[in-house]
Amino acid sequence: MRVQVYWNLHKMCWSVVALEGEDKGRVIDYVNYFAITNATLVVQPAGQARVRLEGKKNVHAFVRGEVESLGWTREQHRGWRRIRYNPYRDACFMQDLMPDEWVDGIPVLPVNWAARVDLEPGAIAWAYKAEWR
């Protein structure tokens, strides 16, 4: 099932929105842990501009893809990267790099797709095989 997931600042958990089926467009669950495969990391520019203009957050960034798991299942693999998004600083999701991977002293790279994204409490997200497409 295709969904999009975002960090809910009011409930302090992940909100899961159905992208297909009879509940399309509706929040179908609130979870602490979630895994998505074939994940697209989306930032809507108009929503981001509004955040910067008004100084208060709105839902405009999310992870979209196929449901993998509602529970904690992340296996430790080489290649997992922490990903994050700051609407006041970044135009897209960014992946943290190890010091030996920095490019011109920059510790992050943009990312908009990953083979899998695991979401944890506290708005923490991990991506496996993350890249810019």
Positions of the model-derived regions?
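Structural detector for short beta-strands of small beta-barrel domains
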Residues: 1-8
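Acidic, low-complexity, intrinsically disordered interaction modules
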Residues: 11, 15-123
